[in-house]
Amino acid sequence: MVATSRNQLNSYFVSEMEALRSNASQFGEKYPNIASELALSNGRSRDPHVEHLLQSFAWMHSRLRLMVESESSKLATILLQQFYPQLVASTPSMSIAEFEVDGFAANFGDGYLLPGGSLMEPVNLLSTNEASSDYGKCRFSTCYDTLLWPLEVLSVKKELSSQYPELETRFSRVQSVLKIELGESQPGAAENLDFGNPVRFFIDVDEEYRFLFLEILYRHLIGVAVLDHEGKIRKILDRGAFKVNGFDDDERIFPRDSKQELGLTLLHDYFTFPEKFLFFELRGLESLAVATKEEEVKEFASFALVLNEKLPEKIPLNHRSIKLNCAPVTNLFQKTSEPIPVNNKEFRHKLAMDRQKPDDYEIYRVEKVFSIDSRGQQRELVPYFSPALSENVEDKYGWISQFEESYHRKNQGNDVWLSFFNADHERDAPTSETIFAKTICCNNSLCESMPVGQEFALIGSGPLNSIKLVSRPSRYRKSSLGEERQWQLLSHLSLYHVALSEPNTARDSLRQALDLYVNQEDLVGQRQIESIEQLDAEEGVAPSKIGGWRGYYRGTKYTLVLNERKFEGSPTLFGSVLNQYLALFSHINSFSSLELKLGNERVFKWQPMTGHKILA
């Protein structure tokens, strides 16, 4: 899609040319002697030099007009950069990676922790198109900490509940059982595992059934059984042993900022990369005795997921339908900008990551800015909005980064400019010094054409044999820096002064808020928002035992009604995200709760929450 600002500049240029030619025609009619000499009487000059002057003037005036109008949106953009930078920055490509571990290369007692932000580079390039030669510049990083295990899924099977009499005795409503059989990735690799942490799985069924499968687990899972390698039930646990991932504060896709509210971050994650929520974890393997095997067998243990609904036959299942050792990865990485000499001739300075190939990199966020003097002394410059700038220190400079649409790139993208101010809030810069910045970058749209199965290698050490993409990278999306959208986003973030309790406006208010997070090309997201038929809110009370205090909280109970025919995806997942968002509207010593309905059918009811904590 062509960038909005370029379209706007073209529109301004056309209007300026039409105005010039129209006025020229009128001028020629009024002053034929002068106009005939200039050949303007027909509104379009036959003299190429005159036409060149007209077009040059129209371009200069339209560009000036665009710059003046863009100034009015800078305040909103700068404020958004401070509080919610992910709403201003472009959205990089994201994917799901599968890690093949070496079970004897590390201590896997409670799982090996692969830190968030671990970098990966592509190897053994598969694609043969023109872009494949540049894939080597791409870098992906893990979004958050991931536990790896020397295990693999051997089989995923639907089984009859009659095969497990113990489960039928424990759960009266059991209808079917989903058995996930685990095996050692290497013989003997699982002998010293303690399983002090839960085991996390990724749902990798056929794309059209992924969210249906998640919906079934969400709504119909009532218990979990743990079986040993011989198939004997060792533990029977309730639904609490099962958890859908992606909702915790430390499970954000994009680099977090302490100022970002979790509810708004989840909305952004959901509408940009919903596959992030296709993870679930199971507890119960802790203290499981691993029998000594007389011969090498790969089977280790199994999970039996107890469901009160039969699994649809149309969902094909095999040993690759559910995977271990997977994690979301994003095309974000740290990179240092090229040095920029500072002088008094320019009031702002453009950051460049690679002057030879500027299209290969785009800045997602500026982390730190440094300056170096002629003696090689380096110092860090503080952000303009930092309290440190107000300290009475000589030669103290503050910096502000501004995102603007690039007119020089072949591909869509933004440029980043740095402006400097002194402690008196006047434009000033560390002249005769050289500046550079530590940034978080992406590769623009380069990674989105990578194929499924592309191999990667970890940059650094780790007990990994290989890394592969199990899903095609999502599309890169350039941020919208239009004036109207920026002010809409900023006003939306003032949600604490907005009420959703008005029955006549609650549904429309919620729809308008969600529209700000959905890309116009995301038809599924658009249909999900359009499926919201009703949002009701009423006052209520809920018991609480937080901190040993027993009593009642006052709060708001929301009821969300969706149109089942319009909605596409997992309604319960959608409701879980909205439940966290609605929690932002609760005040101190109050709660919020959500009940989800599809038409007249009650689907799910979440426990009351105060902030993002469930009331005990």
Predicted ranges, named:
Residues L53-F57, L79, L217, C326-P328, ...:
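Short, Φ-rich (hydrophobic/aromatic) sequence segments
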Residues P187-K396:
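Short, low-complexity Pro/Thr/Gly
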